[in-house]
């Protein structure tokens, strides 16, 4: 369980956790694979979300998934780029979260194994990404400002020691 005082400080930064959908490169599931290849090459991301026509996250795609299709024969072929759709290649088994309903602790646990998590609303519509990087930035904020917000007293400190410490700090 995350300490309530730490959770409070993290929640102060939680608005900056979410990178909004308007700033995220994505492809649609019915796009030609060629389109995904171009997007991934241009934006230099390793993985991007795949959305359906209703802007729900239905998958993830990487450049490696596309190049695997190009290498299925004995030589490199660009034919699959024109013949296949993104939905034919995308990863369908992935984690996504509803930012409002997912606890900070659950977010942190999911980010251990995922560099980012697609964030959806209650209807499954893509809202943006929660990234490990943004979470680490929030944690950095907590580590560097905790003492500005809270007086931390070791549990093994006696009452006279505590009183002396408080008096000395004034």
Task: Specify the residue positions occupied by each region the protein language model found.
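Tandem CBS (Cystathionine beta-synthase) repeat/Bateman regulatory domains
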Residues: 1-170
